[in-house]
Structures are given as structure tokens and as C-alpha cells.
């Protein structure tokens, strides 16, 4: 009897711990994202060439990118609320569509910025790889949901949102580099751009595998006990 209660309580505790953990993660991401949006959009809120520097002649592409990106950063967390899709499926779908439109707008702005950028090839190619990864993860997520595969859709949209946050991750990595008094050369900047989405994806994949193992492992003792109980009687 005690083992049966323990077998039931353990998964409940695991789910509760998982929900609390994800809540902390999303709250932290929300705080960092809001700070990033206020800082970046505040910087370019005044039409001043000294604030825009090299983006002054390309401010149209810049604002296209920032406007679409702001939509995705703000709407992204709403899509991952546990009860949101079940309670408001139509609203969830429309919010997702607006998110996708925002992503396409941001990618259009990014394409214009990359095409007109005087930056070295390694930096432009790193930006292009980020945009391509962003679009690819969204496409795979869309294919999954059109096939009725909800779990893969959710996982791929999580990956997509981690790429959405790559500018914020890049900013954190760049500040860490400056704090270490290391010179931000073009090659270093390109490496940070790649790491800004590769590192979060690697961390997510590792955490996803660990959670899967934890979900499976409690079932093994129960199955073993079920198999051995007839013999013991």
C-alpha cells in the first residue's frame, strides 16, 4: 500500500517541480526581455544620427526588424502557458499566427540589414544563419501541428523562441566579453552570434533529455514489482 501511494506521489511532485521550474524560467526571461526591449527601443526612439550610427541610412530596415521582433518577444511567452491552448484554443491559434507574422516581418528587416551591411562576411553570415534557423524551427513546428502532433509542435516552438531571444543572449555574452576586457573583434562577434542561439538550444536539448529520463525511471520499479508480485504469491 505504501509503495503504491509513493508511486503516485512521486510523479505528482515531479510535475509540480517541473511547473515551478518552468514558471521561474519564463518569469526570468520575461524580465530580461522587457529590459532589452525598453533599452533598444528607447535608444532608437529619437531620430538622431548619433544614436543610430551605422543604422541611420538603414533605419527603415532596422525598425522593420525591431517591430516584428518585439511582437515575437512579447507574444512568445503567452503561447507556452500550460492552460492557455486548452482553455482558449482559438485565441491561441490567432496569437500564434500574429507571432508568425511578426517573425516574418522581423526576418524581412533582417534580410535588408544583412544585404546592406558593411560588416565583414563572417558577421553577415552569422546573422543569416540565425535568421535561417529561426525560420526553419518555425516551419517544422507548423508542419507538426498541421499533422496533429501537439508535443513536437510545442518542443519546436520552444526551440524557435530560444532563437527569438538570441539578440538578448548575444547582448549578455557581449557584456560578459567586455567585462573580461577582451577586444570584440569581427571574428569574436561572429562567434558570439552563433553561440547566442546554439548555446540555448544545446541547454534545452540536454534538459529535455534529462526530463524524459526522469519521467521514465520511476515507472521501471513499478513495472518490476508488478512482474515479480505473481511469483512471490
Regions found by a protein language model. Give the residues of each.
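Alpha-helical membrane insertion/targeting regions
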Residues: 2-233
Amino acid at each position: 500500500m505504501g509503495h503504491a501511494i509513493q508511486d503516485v506521489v512521486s510523479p505528482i511532485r515531479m510535475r509540480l517541480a517541473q511547473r515551478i521550474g518552468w514558471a521561474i524560467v519564463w518569469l526570468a526571461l520575461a524580465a530580461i526581455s522587457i529590459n532589452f526591449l525598453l533599452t533598444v527601443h528607447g535608444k532608437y526612439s529619437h531620430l538622431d544620427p548619433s544614436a543610430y550610427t551605422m543604422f541611420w541610412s538603414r533605419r527603415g530596415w532596422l525598425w522593420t526588424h525591431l517591430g516584428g521582433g518585439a511582437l515575437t518577444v512579447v507574444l512568445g511567452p503567452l503561447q507556452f502557458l500550460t492552460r492557455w491552448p486548452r482553455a482558449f484554443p482559438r485565441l491561441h491559434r490567432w496569437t500564434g499566427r500574429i507571432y508568425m507574422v511578426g517573425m516574418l516581418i522581423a526576418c524581412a528587416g533582417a534580410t535588408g540589414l544583412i544585404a546592406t551591411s558593411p560588416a565583414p562576411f563572417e558577421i553577415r553570415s552569422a546573422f543569416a544563419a540565425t535568421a535561417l534557423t529561426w525560420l526553419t524551427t518555425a516551419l517544422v513546428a507548423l508542419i507538426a501541428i498541421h499533422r496533429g502532433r501537439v508535443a513536437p509542435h510545442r518542443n519546436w516552438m520552444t526551440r524557435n523562441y530560444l532563437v527569438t531571444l538570441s539578440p538578448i543572449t548575444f547582448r549578455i555574452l557581449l557584456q560578459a566579453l567586455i567585462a573580461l576586457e577582451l577586444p570584440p573583434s569581427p571574428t569574436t562577434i561572429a562567434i558570439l552570434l552563433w553561440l547566442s542561439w546554439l548555446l540555448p538550444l544545446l541547454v534545452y536539448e540536454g534538459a529535455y533529455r534529462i526530463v524524459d529520463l526522469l519521467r521514465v525511471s520511476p515507472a521501471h520499479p513499478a513495472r518490476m514489482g508488478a512482474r515479480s508480485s505473481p511469483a512471490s504469491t
